[in-house]
Amino acid sequence: GGKYKEYQTLCENYACAKLTGATEGLVNFEDKPFKAYLNKKMSKRAKLNIAHGALNFIEKTFRPEALPQLYDMAAFGRSLIAIPLKNGTCIDVKLLASPFQEEGELMLLMFLGDRRVYSICFSCTADGQAWIGGIQGGKDIDNEEVKALTKELYGIRPKNLIITLLYGFLSHFNIKEIYAIDSHYHVKSERVKTSYSELWLEIGGEKHRRGWYKLPPSEIKKSLEEVKSKHRSQFIKREGLKELAQLDLAAALRDICVKRNG
């Protein structure tokens, strides 16, 4: 139809579509409406609408010189920030054109040295929506290490930290309408080991229709009054770390994004 023709023209002209096409292993933008994308029960029309919005978001958000860095698969994209740990090391946060395009065009990753701790894949549209298609812990980090890392982060679990980072990313672009996939509707649901719904509910999500959860427009925060007095200093450090990470992230995004009005 007309919308697909217009979309095809954008795919032929946009730098991000060309980079996606030139990067080994990535699904071409033109093929997205016809392939597995975000939700295995989604119609071609719904896929086209999101892919069209995502194409515009990426092309119009990132500076032309920053775009190729996002597609540098060997380097896992562009480093954004470092989050300091208690022991003096840090977690590196990167933004990458997602190697799993079917879970969304963009991926935020957390690394400890050269090991991936957590990653989340998502699509953002030019009209202010986000669609989260996958979240995954690192294969070379075991449960004991996750526990140790949680201690180093004043009690923040790595998967909650990546959610905080995603919220920081989305709020920078004023994206408030956020949907997250139910693992049963994940494009490769047979390979998903964990139940996503538990996490979406824990962070305040509500069951939406057709395999989606709708997440709160911004991260829900506990207030100090809700925390037992003996845990308060830890809580304050935790919140401080999250807040600083989001501020650093916003500054890093300003470096790679086109200046927006307003």
PLM feature segments, named:
Residues 1-149, 235-262:
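Non-catalytic substrate-recognition and accessory regions of acyl/acetyltransferase enzymes
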Residues 117-118, 123-207:
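Acyl-donor binding region in acyl/amide transferases
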Residues 182-241, 245, 253:
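Active-site/acyl-donor-binding loops of N-acyltransferases
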